[in-house]
Amino acid sequence: MTSSTTTAVPGLLLAGGLARRMGGGDKPMRVIAGRTLLAHVITRLAPQCEPLVLNANGDPARFAAYGLTVVPDDVPGFAGPLAGILAGLDWVASHRPAAQRMISVAADCPFLPRDLVARLTAACMAEDTDLALAASGGHTHPVIGLWPVRLREDLRHALVSEDIRKVTRFTARYKVATVTWPVVPRDPFFNANTAEDLAEAERLAAMEDRDA
């Protein structure tokens, strides 16, 4: 169940990448601690958002077991995470018209903070910003953020007419709140890009289970 401060915030799981560093395929379907990365992300985010929507390209049937609506990119040619964010914003505008904002996360981040939505929402409101992005360890994570639905036409123009692909090139146009999380005992935004990262995620998950 979501709290009263986050009930109206839909969540978008970005799984539209090509996973080149892992030899292709669906990176969020890789397994750690007996469950897929995607399952870990859903466990973390579902109590904070409603509904959850998955951005992925190709046959949506491969995600049927998760019971999520799957929205593909509308911009052709694997245009990157901005295309997935636009697909999510378009879905929210059509299916949750009362929602003013949407949270986006990478679907390969199994240790997302349980206060992600609450803190990003609070920062956006307190600082009166257009966007709020997560940060840790001195790095901003541009695909993990809170996006106003009203920016979707600006984003569409940036993608289609300006050929902008880098998330930070787009967000630099707006006032952004950056919210930082500690990296101890582990970075909550750790993501698995390589086989070595998967092994590290296994180790971190085992530590978390032991300390729970």
Swiss-Prot record:
This is Molybdenum cofactor guanylyltransferase. GO terms for cellular component: cytoplasm. Mg(2+) binds at residue 108. It holds the Pfam family NTP_transf_3. It catalyses: Mo-molybdopterin + GTP + H(+) = Mo-molybdopterin guanine dinucleotide + diphosphate. The lineage of its organism: Bacteria, Pseudomonadati, Pseudomonadota, Alphaproteobacteria, Hyphomicrobiales. The gene is mobA. Monomer. It comes from Bradyrhizobium sp. (strain ORS 278). Belongs to the MobA family. Its main location: cytoplasm.
